[in-house]
């Protein structure tokens, strides 16, 4: 039997005004958890709600989406993710934070929601947590196939 406490991970999709959050308690499957809305670029507003989630689920690892350009260049959004990673490491030293390529995760999330006939308002409300779930699941699948490469 898996020890859920040791495998609890969060997937995060960081935007300018939203943070999509996904959870895996088993290290096998990701599920969308919630979207936190915050004032534009006020990332410090995310610390208290994340602290609550980290404590509640005894999170050991955070997989933070890393939005590289399609040509692999690092733009401003990736630099913001790098800054946010350092902030998380400083605030939650006991939690490992890993940057993970998130290219096209939001596009994929929107397609999933459209396929399920979600209305525009629901798509805008849910796309980030679905994207976070995709990011986390991609990481979990990679680790399953490459167990010696766990970051």
From Swiss-Prot:
The protein's enzyme class: hydrolase
One example GO MF annotation: nuclease activity
An individual GO BP term: rRNA 5'-end processing
First-listed, main subcellular location of the protein, grouped into a coarse class: cytoplasm
Cytoplasm as UniProt keyword: yes
Subcellular location(s) of the protein: Cytoplasm
UniProt cross-references to Gene3D superfamilies, sorted A to Z: YqgF/RNase H-like domain
Pfam families per the UniProt record, alphabetical: RuvX
Cellular component GO terms held in the UniProt record: cytosol
Keywords: Cytoplasm, Hydrolase, Nuclease, Ribosome biogenesis
Superkingdom of origin: Bacteria
Annotated EC: 3.1.-.-
Role played: Could be a nuclease involved in processing of the 5'-end of pre-16S rRNA.
NCBIfam families cross-referenced by the UniProt entry: RNAse_H_YqgF (TIGR00250)
Family: Belongs to the YqgF nuclease family.
Protein known as: Putative pre-16S rRNA nuclease
UniProt organism field: Aster yellows witches'-broom phytoplasma (strain AYWB)
């Amino acid at each position: 039997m898996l020890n859920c406490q040791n495998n609890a991970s969060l997937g995060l999709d960081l935007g300018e005004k939203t943070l999509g959050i996904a959870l895996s308690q088993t290290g096998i499957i990701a599920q969308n958890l919630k979207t936190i809305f915050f004032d534009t670029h006020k990332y410090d507003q995310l610390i208290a709600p994340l602290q609550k989630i980290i404590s509640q689920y005894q999170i050991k690892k955070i997989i933070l989406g890393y939005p590289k350009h399609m040509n692999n260049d690092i733009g401003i959004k990736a630099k913001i993710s790098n800054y946010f990673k350092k902030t998380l490491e400083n605030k939650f030293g006991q939690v490992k934070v890993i940057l993970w390529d998130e290219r096209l995760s939001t596009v994929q999330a929107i397609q999933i929601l459209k396929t399920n006939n979600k209305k525009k308002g629901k798509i805008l409300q849910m796309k980030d947590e679905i994207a976070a779930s995709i990011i986390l699941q991609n990481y979990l699948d990679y680790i399953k196939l490459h167990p010696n490469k766990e970051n």
